[in-house]
């Protein structure tokens, strides 16, 4: 059942992104919207490994994270539909959205269920995740924070500072780098001396693994 559910979520994210792309082409959506097509399995698999009360932070390319997290938090088909409607309403800037339409495509959040939100600032969510993990440690919960970001964000100061603090303070945070091999138009090989982002983990005394996200 879990595997079928993950497949369904993956297909729903792709369908969602295809529809958003169509709406963008028709100028129905206002402002920028960064699609997650091709990376669906990362969000579904990573979030599927969480407990129901764990937390996530997302990126400007966050539709997939929002759907996977909200769908897995929903217990019934009716709740799943309500989640989908609220997420789509948010993308469209409608008052029925998770953030009453004020967040839009790049700032979807559902704090009540553990989605601490997306951000339009590349790498801006990484220190937020570390702060949330510090809060969990201080409150002595058993919650984990899952932090998504791209390869471009791993070249920002936020990344290095946040990883150093997370390791130093032994915080319950998992960093998931969704490396699509390009930051804007710059290929990874021309922006990093190391072949894999995960190779940087050892500098902060933490494990780093490369996982096939396809």
Q: What is each model feature region?
A:
Residues 61, 178-181, 213-214:
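Short, ordered loop/turn segments at secondary-structure junctions
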Residues 18-21, 28-169, 187-193, 198, ...:
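Cofactor-binding active-site loop characterized by glycine-rich and histidine/acidic residues
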Residues 152, 212-213:
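Short loop or secondary-structure boundary microenvironments that flank
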Residues 8-24:
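N-terminal glycine-rich anion-binding loops that anchor highly charged ligand groups
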Residues 207-211:
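Structural signal for short hydrophobic segments within the conserved structured cores
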Residues 163, 173-175, 179:
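A positional/architectural concept
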Residues 183-185:
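A short acidic, helix-capping loop that chelates divalent metal ions and anchors anionic groups
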Residues 1-3:
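Charged, compositionally biased N-terminal leader segments and the immediate start
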């Amino acid at each position: 059942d879990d595997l079928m559910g993950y497949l369904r979520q993956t297909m729903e994210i792709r369908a969602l992104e295809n529809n958003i792309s169509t709406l963008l082409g028709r100028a129905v959506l206002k402002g920028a919207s960064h699609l997650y097509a091709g990376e669906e399995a990362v969000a579904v698999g990573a979030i599927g490994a969480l407990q129901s009360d764990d937390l996530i932070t997302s990126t400007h390319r966050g539709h997939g994270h929002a759907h996977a997290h909200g769908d897995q938090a929903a217990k019934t088909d009716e709740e799943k539909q309500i989640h989908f409607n609220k997420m789509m309403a948010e993308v469209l800037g409608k008052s029925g959205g998770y953030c009453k339409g004020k967040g839009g495509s790049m700032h979807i959040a559902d704090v009540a269920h553990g989605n601490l939100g997306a951000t339009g600032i590349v790498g801006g969510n990484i220190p937020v995740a570390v702060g949330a993990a510090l809060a969990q440690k201080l409150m002595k919960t058993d919650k984990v924070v899952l932090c998504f970001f791209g390869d471009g964000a791993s070249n920002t100061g936020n990344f290095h500072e946040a990883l150093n603090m997370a390791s130093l303070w032994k915080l319950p945070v998992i960093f998931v780098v969704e490396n699509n091999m390009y930051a804007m138009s710059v290929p990874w090989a021309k922006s990093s001396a190391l072949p894999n982002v995960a190779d940087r983990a050892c500098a902060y005394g933490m494990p780093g693994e490369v996982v096939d996200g396809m």
